[in-house]
Structures are given as structure tokens and as C-alpha cells.
A protein has these predicted regions:
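Non-catalytic signal-transmission and effector/linker regions of two-component phosphorelay proteins
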Residues: 1-15, 120-133
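The feature encodes the CheY-like receiver
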Residues: 24, 66-68, 85, 97, ...
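Charged docking surfaces used in two-component/phosphorelay signaling
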Residues: 25-33
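Acidic, metal-coordinating helix/loop segments flanking the phosphotransfer/catalytic sites
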Residues: 40-59
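Hydrophobic/aromatic residues positioned on beta-strands within the core alpha/beta folds
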Residues: 90-92
Length: 133
């Protein structure tokens, strides 16, 4: 179930998809404090539902290991959608193996961040990605 953000933000709109409630809370709090509008979901199918809908996102943060569909499956589907092909995607995961990283980039990820992560560094990476797009 998506937790909708309450207001529009000039910094952009981000979708957070992670099955761990405490990680979602940390990310939502961090991003809202940085003036982003944030929606969050706990599984792959919910992420796909929002991404396939009419709402536009400026960036998507995806965990790899989620129920229903992995973050990599969501990324693969996202890149097939005509109206969402260019949405930047950051994979945020505890799976830091080279094979996972390679697969994510081969599917079109813009960045790959391993958990645990530095909130300051994550925000800097998000800003960098949004500035280049």
C-alpha cells in the first residue's frame, strides 16, 4: 500500500520501494526533510502499479529483494514503459555483489548504493542524478 505524500515539492517527486519498514521510514524522513515529495511502497507489484499509472516520478529508489517482484524486475519493466524509460533509478540494497551491480546497470539503473548507506552521500548522489537529467 502506498503512503502518499501530502504536498507538491519544488525539488521533485521520489518513489521509495523497500520491504523493510524501518528503511522506508528513514528514507521518507530523509527525503521529505530535503524537500522532496515521497511515495513509499513495500513490494514490487505496488511499485509497478504506481510506475505504470499516470503519476510521474523524478527518481525511483528500489531495493532488490522485495516480495512479489524484485527491484531488478521492477527496473526491467520500468525500462519497457514508453512514458517511463528515462526515469532515473537508484538501486539501494544490502546485496553488494558485483553480479548484482552489473545486472542493475545492464537493466538501466543510474546508480547502485549498498546498505548501510550514508544519508548525506545518498542525498548528494540523488541531487547529482537529478541535476544531470
Amino acid at each position: 500500500m502506498a503512503l502518499p505524500a501530502t504536498d507538491r515539492s519544488p525539488r521533485g517527486r521520489i518513489l521509495v520501494a523497500d520491504d523493510e519498514p524501518h528503511i522506508r521510514r528513514i528514507l521518507v524522513t530523509l527525503l521529505e526533510a530535503a524537500s522532496f515529495q515521497v511515495d513509499s511502497v513495500a513490494d514490487g507489484p505496488a511499485a509497478l502499479e504506481l510506475l505504470e499509472g499516470q503519476d510521474a516520478y523524478d527518481l525511483v529508489l528500489l531495493d532488490i529483494m522485495m516480495p512479489g517482484a524484485t527491484g531488478l524486475e521492477v527496473l526491467d519493466r520500468l525500462r519497457e514503459l514508453d512514458h517511463r524509460q528515462s526515469v532515473p533509478v537508484v538501486i539501494l540494497t544490502a546485496k553488494g555483489q558485483d553480479a548484482d551491480r552489473d545486472e542493475a546497470f545492464n537493466l538501466g539503473a543510474d546508480d547502485f548504493v549498498t546498505k548501510p548507506f550514508s544519508p548525506k552521500k545518498l542525498l548528494a548522489r540523488i541531487d547529482e542524478i537529478l541535476e544531470r537529467d
